[in-house]
């Protein structure tokens, strides 16, 4: 491949803004929706009847978003080209009774969401963000993006073996953040604080979905700014790339043989089994209703699904210079080497030979290099929404993503080239 596409500072700057502004899945879909609106997409409600008009549309349900672009004159049986991603990331989430404390410290009770690198949350300034449910049935987003919480590590003088035997954390006792002093802990203190922050009346908040986040901003790193450090790259990097790709394809308004789709799900990190997860009904419902809105039949629906393809885009593992032996000896994806194609013969990833050919063709069209990832046989392989999408909807699915280090850390690392290379490959795929 000659003169492949390289780093675009504008794309990566925008990714950094997107990461910083999206501390929860609810913020991520709101920010993605704003980008779609600017590109001419319009929101449709699941409770309304859908019309047959062409153009860009999207649905938001909680922390999930499905967006699609219908070309002028698209037949009911027109197949879909789908980019799948997820909006959630591992973190610490606030329990139903959050107010606690001990020995003169005020604390917040949290539960572990997904599989975070727990040590990365220690001694880090944390904010609080998410969604508040109000007495009148409405919801409000909240983002306390300043140092509010901290999980302090035990001093080495009280844990002399930590440097030789490794850090051992009890998930219940050792990860409850502090947020002040005082032994007088009252139920409702945290929610009263949030109500005051948002200018709400006392008692107006009756439910919440709240989570911690690092308040340190994303940043360029390295001698030549070749690296990008930031939170929630797994998997907002893919959500951002998918949004950019879909809006670019819609703006070009070329003669598309497929209907391009972005499916950004919640709850991937804990199994996808929810009404907003990939194992729920949302994607299938949206695709079916798109077919039926264009006067399609169940036969048209079957034809459309049979001809569709999904790229499940989720971050993957770049080879780690300090732990190269943890990777497969002959598959060492490099940071900066372009998107990775994920393969696993036990269907932990959905890629097969024909799927590889589809992605290779998209990368060739985009003049983007790609790499292949296979797990070391002695290490268990993770999974993605890819196999779920393939099994649930009968849609051919290919697992890909950008290569990063420190996956599931409060702060992850990638090469500055890779987000733009991924987005370009997605554009070529959606164009068909």
Curated annotation (Swiss-Prot):
GO terms for biological process: proteolysis. InterPro entries: M18_aminopeptidase_2, Peptidase_M18, Peptidase_M18_dom2. Its EC number is 3.4.11.-. Its cofactor is Zn(2+). Disulfide bonds: none annotated. GO terms for cellular component: cytoplasm. Zn(2+) binds at residues 86, 157, 408. Keywords: Aminopeptidase, Hydrolase, Metal-binding, Metalloprotease, Protease, Zinc. One of its GO terms (molecular function) is aminopeptidase activity. NCBIfam families: PRK02813.1. This is Probable M18 family aminopeptidase 2. It comes from Streptomyces avermitilis (strain ATCC 31267 / DSM 46492 / JCM 5070 / NBRC 14893 / NCIMB 12804 / NRRL 8165 / MA-4680). The gene is apeB.
């Amino acid at each position: 491949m000659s003169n492949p596409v390289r780093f675009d500072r504008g794309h990566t700057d925008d990714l950094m803004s997107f990461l910083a502004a999206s501390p929860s899945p609810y913020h991520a879909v709101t920010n993605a929706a704003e980008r779609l609106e600017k590109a001419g997409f319009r929101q449709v409600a699941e409770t309304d009847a859908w019309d047959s008009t062409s153009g860009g549309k999207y649905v938001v349900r909680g922390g999930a978003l499905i967006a699609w672009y219908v070309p002028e004159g698209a037949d009911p049986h027109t197949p879909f080209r789908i980019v799948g991603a997820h909006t959630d990331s591992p973190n610490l989430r606030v329990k139903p009774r959050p107010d606690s404390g001990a020995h003169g410290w005020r604390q917040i009770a949290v539960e572990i969401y997904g599989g975070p690198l727990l040590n990365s949350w220690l001694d880090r300034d944390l904010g609080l963000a998410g969604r508040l449910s109000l007495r009148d049935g409405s919801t409000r987003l909240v983002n306390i993006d300043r140092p509010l919480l901290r999980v302090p590590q035990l001093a080495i003088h009280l844990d002399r073996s930590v440097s030789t035997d490794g850090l051992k954390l009890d998930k219940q006792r050792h990860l409850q953040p502090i947020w002040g002093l005082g032994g007088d802990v009252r139920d409702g203190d945290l929610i009263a604080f949030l109500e005051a922050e948002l200018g709400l009346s006392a008692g107006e908040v009756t439910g919440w979905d709240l989570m911690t986040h690092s308040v340190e901003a994303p940043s360029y790193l390295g001698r030549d700014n070749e690296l990008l450090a930031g939170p929630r790259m797994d998997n907002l990097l893919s959500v951002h790339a998918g949004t950019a790709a879909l809006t670019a394809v819609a703006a070009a308004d070329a003669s598309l043989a497929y209907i391009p789709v972005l499916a950004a799900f919640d709850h991937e990190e804990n199994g996808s089994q929810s009404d907003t997860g990939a194992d729920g009904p949302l994607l299938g419902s949206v695709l079916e209703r798109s077919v039926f809105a264009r006067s399609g039949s169940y036969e048209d629906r079957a034809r459309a699904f049979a001809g569709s393809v999904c790229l499940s885009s989720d971050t993957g593992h770049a080879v780690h210079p300090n732990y190269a032996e943890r990777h497969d000896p002959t598959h060492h994806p490099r940071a900066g080497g372009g998107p990775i194609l994920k393969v696993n013969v036990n269907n932990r990833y959905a890629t097969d030979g024909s799927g590889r050919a589809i992605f290779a063709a998209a990368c060739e069209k985009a003049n983007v290099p790609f790499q292949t990832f296979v797990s070391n046989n002695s290490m268990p392989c993770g999974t993605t929404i890819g196999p779920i999408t393939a099994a649930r909807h009968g849609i051919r699915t290919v697992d890909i993503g950008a290569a990063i280090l420190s996956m599931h850390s409060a702060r992850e690392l990638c090469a500055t080239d890779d987000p733009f290379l991924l987005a370009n490959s997605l554009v070529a795929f959606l164009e068909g």
